[in-house]
């Protein structure tokens, strides 16, 4: 049995030999193991750390100069008299730090929220499937951002990075130089600043902002990392600096691999533009092409990138009973679809993801069945599944879309013949004027879905259909007692059929669709304002409005409301029993 006293070479040799390899409980630092052949790794509770223990030094705070608030910044704060410091050589600023088993964030301006920049990019987005921008951005537009006059005065930018928000994704890049109001990046961002009408940004790794307990600053010139400790933390507090991108990795195609019973923590992915879903970031478990893989009973926490990522074709990957939480990016990311043998993620608890990269998605995968998971506290979408002929069922999703927009509890594009049933989504409302924060979102080129017996509670926008169609929505319950409700069918030549659904809102209900793009049969509506509006759309624009016509098969009902803890939902003759949503007990 492997134990923490074994050398790295001894552990790697045991894994290289294949077969069953058991680890004794304990903490294994500098964990970075290559997998080359069929192997069954049994953790027995072992904690694998992809980094090294920090030897803290208590130092006087060198950043005590008074920094007044600028627009969008926090008010002045009293600085700590001392900080914890360690050596941290390296040209790139560290983004990850693990203290007491949790990720810590870098010092940030503003302390929360975002600043406004002055860049504009008034070019129409045509849709991903139609090639993106109507005009391709120039190199200069992808490399620069214009800030407000004086916004960066008095700020040390030697080791600074900047997050540029792009509605449904973000770019985190190094600041190369500043000339007047123009910030130049070290690498191009994903979309031009100001695109999609979004003009927000924030700065990271600013010493003048090191005024919040639990944050850190990495001075790349001096090779020092400074940490502002939380109450109760001192130079004896256990902390780790990451050394590796991955803890387990396979560079070549791998098959018949099983990993169970480990805690994995402390990784630092490469500094790249992460793109949609942060898919460019590596995972604590990093695979290429993989088949017959089982990952179960894992606790993946405090890693800087994804929990699990596969970049190649995946056959029969089974992810079950994993707890993936408090991480920089998403829990699961697979990039390549496989229509031959389906994979599955089931009975997992996923939460507090996207801590470093807001565009990260809880579960983002191709051709995966997604069953009995609990996903919450995500910066962007909870689920984003692509492919064909799979099932999304009995998942419990809440507190999602906390930062970005144009996403959903469940969001899919270019998918076919999918069944989504018996899922429960709670609490997605507009934020800062943005309404595209949706419960169930079928996006470009999705076809032939059956969406049945799902519930969305306190969701302003329970259902969005965009450039897709041939879907059946059957016997779902959508409730927003907090205000108005929207659902729609936009920019499509196909149809959506709504049969036996319940829509209940504490305000008006608006159905946006192109003429005759939806059919309605035996649906029940309640609007507290008494208004159920049909906005007639063409090419994404409203060209007329009328009241949605009720008939013998579509009719008004009394208000519908449920407590958050409710799991059996009854409206008239329709009952949806969701007592078994989320992870099951073994």
Regions picked out by a protein language model, each given a short descriptive name:
Residues 18, 24-27, 33-38, 43-46, ...:
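Beta-strand repeat scaffolds of extracellular/surface proteins
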Residues 189-196, 204-205, 231-254, 268, ...:
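Beta-propeller domains
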Residues 22, 34, 42, 49, ...:
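Extracellular beta-strand solenoid repeats
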Residues 255-266, 291-302, 315-328, 339-354, ...:
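Right-handed parallel beta-helix
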Residues 248-250, 276-291, 301-302, 306-315, ...:
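Aromatic- and glycine-enriched glycan-recognition loops and surfaces
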Residues 3-294, 299-301, 538-586:
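Extracellular polysaccharide-degrading/modifying enzymes targeting complex plant/algal/animal polysaccharides
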